[in-house]
Amino acid sequence: MEERDRTGRTGQPQHRINQPSTARERANSVDAYGFQRSDDFDYETHEQLMSEYLAVLTRRSIRWAKLLQGRRRVDRNLKVKRYVRKGVPNEHRPLVWMVCSGAQEQMDRNPGYYQSLLDTHHEPKLEESIRTDLHRTFPDNIYFRKSAEPCLQQALYNVLVAYGHHNKAVGYCQGMNFIAGYLILVSKDEETSFWLMEALLSRILPDYYTPAMLGLKTDQEVLGELVRLKAPAVWKLMQDQGVMWTLVVSRWFICLFIDVLPVETVLRIWDCLFYEGSKILFRVALTLIRHHQQEIAEAQNLPDVCERFKRITRGAFVEDCHTFMQKIFQEPGSLSMATVSKLRESCRARIIADES
């Protein structure tokens, strides 16, 4: 009979399974969307945030499933708007984005159109511009590497070349590759990505990507006017230092916060962008600036201003996407579409006058 010690255990050696002792060891070095995490990624904070956010995701998933009930339609009402603001589960994003943006209606009206664009003769200049940017698009994402099976670079090329033929006034410009890449990662479907891109570039954000980029320039100036009203200390700093808004926020707008904010935070912003329109971009930008206005206002020179604008897009404030999304509807205060439209009108006129 085996001898036991005073605790009741036998004298046999204990075989222990080595359990990961740190958050870094417990977590994957690649996130849910295929992006390689950086060397300085804060695994401890991420683990803490995800332990809370996973519970939120589970609740949202149950409520969305009950709301949709297997239907391929999404109503426009206060309840759905509230649901969208609280986050669309990833499994429902393609459907919700397509329906809410009007992209589904456009696709249904034009069966076979996407394939016809791929079958047409491709303009050499368009092809060359797109191919040049393919390897620069998300090199840190395992699904866009040439070794991936399938490699999403081909899907990305198809969507971009199709859009270039569809909208010849725009063709292709840098920034569009990142937007198309995110759409492909979420929808996992080329044609869906094409129609979502058409909704974004043609209707939600008109003139952002045309050669003159008048819409983009206008909205950067509109942000400046909103900062003057809602974060005057930052506006004064920008005036005193002679810093143009395009220098610090152009990437926010042209890439729709891709590679600026964390992936899940960007997708939560896009949930609202597809449902509520471009006004959401101003809410995000104003929240980042207002929340950090004291830090920004202490900048001493131009490089310091630029560095502080980079710094405010990192850290726990933006990593906690659920709390951040609540903040964007609180921190900037009232922001009506009528106000945005009026500011756009005056800023656009000023830009045209300055450039003529």
UniProtKB/Swiss-Prot annotation:
Gene3D superfamilies: putative rabgap domain of human tbc1 domain family member 14 like domains, Ypt/Rab-GAP domain of gyp1p, domain 3. It holds the Pfam family RabGAP-TBC. Keywords: GTPase activation. InterPro entries: Rab-GAP-TBC_dom (IPR000195), Rab-GAP_TBC_sf (IPR035969), Rab_GAP_TBC_domain (IPR050302). Disulfide bonds: none annotated. One of its GO terms (cellular component) is cytoplasm. It comes from the Eukaryota. Residues 9-22 have a biased composition (Polar residues). SMART domains: TBC. One of its GO terms (molecular function) is GTPase activator activity. Residues 1-29 are annotated as: Disordered. Residues 87-277 form the Rab-GAP TBC domain. May act as a GTPase-activating protein for Rab family protein(s). This is Growth hormone-regulated TBC protein 1-A. It comes from Danio rerio. The gene is grtp1a.
